[in-house]
Amino acid sequence: MSKAILGLFAVLGILGGYAFAADTLSAQDNFEIQQLYARYNIAIDSGDAEAYAATFTPDGVFNNMAGHDALVGFAKMWREKLNGATRKHWNNNLQITGNSKQANGFVYLMLIDFSTKPASILTTLSYTDTLVKTKAGWRFSKRTTKSDTPPAVADQAPAK
């Protein structure tokens, strides 16, 4: 009887380990999520408000803005605020954890102004993200930012 129980635990352990391994974030999922981060940056930098909003779920949230229309409005406002300046989002140190259905991401951002000579770093911050896999692929369901610049310092920064 003890051999049967031991055998049963061994089989359950193997199957349980396989089930756990089967629902980890695959290399393909990692790649698709990295591409999502790239599409997000390119869309906001190029002023493509619809492409920007499409990186989110329909009810997606960016800081305090929620839903497709609010995200499109934000991207349009951002483009108008630039007033022709060339600014680019540069991400580094991307970390992704999760499984085949949802993931968490963390990444640093440098916002660089290329309309100045030499180019200048406008700000640095971090994104903390919740992502979900939809029928259309990976999308952000929630993105929050945290500035590296304390508000008192940011308020005193020279206007560009």
Task: Specify the residue positions occupied by each region the protein language model found.
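Exposed loop/turn and edge beta-strand positions of beta-sandwich/beta-sheet ligand-binding modules
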Residues: 90, 121, 125
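Bacterial N-terminal signal peptides that target proteins for export
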Residues: 1-7
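Short, low-complexity N-terminal intrinsically disordered segments enriched in polar/charged residues
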Residues: 17-46, 50-58, 69
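Short, cysteine-centered beta-strand-loop-beta hairpins and adjacent loop/turn segments enriched
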Residues: 83-84, 112-121, 150-151
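Bacterial N-terminal signal peptides
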Residues: 7-16
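Short beta-strand edge/turn micro-motifs at domain boundaries
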Residues: 104, 124-157
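Beta-strand elements of well-folded, non-transmembrane domains
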Residues: 109-115, 133, 147
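A solvent-exposed, acidic/Ser-Thr-rich amphipathic alpha-helical stretch
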Residues: 49-111
